[in-house]
């Protein structure tokens, strides 16, 4: 039995060397998940109003992820709507909706 043990120690198994390849998929990890929130100054281009990414940008007064009227993109929409800086504070379907001067659900939801 001592001979068999010495032979096993002398002969390394061939499965140990190619076990881990030198090339690991590390660069695929960082770009796996894109940022959840868009830039503060960017709003979605909706026909009636855009969605704000933050409460401090785009003239949105509701807290995080509310909808506002894209008053800075008035040249894009030919229809002249009431450009108020107020947002709908009442969530509809888990998200705030854009509205007119009174905050009615007349715009898109985010």
From Swiss-Prot:
UniProt keyword annotation of Ubl conjugation present: no
Superkingdom: Eukaryota
One Pfam family named in its UniProt record: LCE
Disulfide bonds: none
Regions of compositional bias (Pro residues) in chain numbering: 11-23
InterPro entries, per the entry: LCE
UniProt keyword annotations, A-Z: Keratinization
Cellular compartments per GO CC: cytosol
Compositionally biased residues, Gly residues: 96-110
Induction trigger: By UVB.
Expression sites by tissue: Skin-specific. Expression was readily detected in adult trunk skin, adult arm skin, fetal skin, penal skin, vulva, esophagus and tongue. Not expressed in the cervix, rectum, lung, colon, or placenta.
Chain residue ranges for the region called Disordered: 1-23, 83-110
One of the protein's GO biological processes: keratinization
Biased composition, class Low complexity, residue ranges: 1-10, 83-95
Subunit field text: Interacts with CYSRT1.
Family recorded in the similarity comment: Belongs to the LCE family.
Function in brief: Precursors of the cornified envelope of the stratum corneum.
Other known facts: Belongs to the LCE cluster present on 1q21.
Name recorded for this polypeptide: Late cornified envelope protein 1A
Species in which this protein is naturally found: Homo sapiens (Human)
Gene behind this protein: LCE1A
